[in-house]
Amino acid sequence: MAKGQSLQDPFLNALRRERIPVSIYLVNGIKLQGQIESFDQFVILLKNTVNQMVYKHAISTVVPARAVSHHSASDRPQGERPQEKTEE
C-alpha cells in the first residue's frame, strides 16, 4: 500500500463502517451528500437517494457529519496505551 493512503483508507473505512453521513466537496465547488457505500484506489461510491461514483481526483474535501475515530490499536506505536478519559 502506498504511504500516502495510510490515513485515507482507515478514515474512509471508518466512515463506511459506521455509516456516518458525509459532505463531499468537489474541486469545482459542488457539494455532494450521502454515506460512503464503498471505495477503492480511484473512486468513492456515495449513496443517497441514488448511488454516485465520485472520482477521488475530483474531490477537494470530505466532511463527516460527526467526529470519527479512525485509528485502530495497530496504528499506535508499540507500547503506547490508548488515552483514558478522566473524570473532573
UniProtKB/Swiss-Prot annotation:
The ranges of region (Disordered) come to: 66-88
Q: Which residues form the Sm domain?
A: 9-68
Q: Which GO terms describe its molecular function?
A: RNA binding
User: Basic and acidic residues compositional bias: what residue ranges?
Assistant: 72-88
**Entry GO terms, CC:** cytosol
Task: List the GO biological process terms.
Answer: regulation of DNA-templated transcription; regulation of RNA stability; regulation of translation, ncRNA-mediated
Q: Report the domain of life of the source organism.
A: Bacteria
User: Which stretches are transmembrane?
Assistant: none
Keyword tags:
RNA-binding, Stress response
Question: SUPFAM superfamilies this protein is in?
Answer: Sm-like ribonucleoproteins (SSF50182)
Stored Pfam families? Hfq
Q: What is the documented function of this protein?
A: RNA chaperone that binds small regulatory RNA (sRNAs) and mRNAs to facilitate mRNA translational regulation in response to envelope stress, environmental stress and changes in metabolite concentrations. Also binds with high specificity to tRNAs.
Known partners and oligomeric status: Homohexamer.
Family recorded in the similarity comment: Belongs to the Hfq family.
Its name, as the record gives it, is RNA-binding protein Hfq
Q: Organism source for this protein?
A: Aliivibrio fischeri (strain ATCC 700601 / ES114)
> Which classification does the entry list for the species?
Bacteria, Pseudomonadati, Pseudomonadota, Gammaproteobacteria, Vibrionales
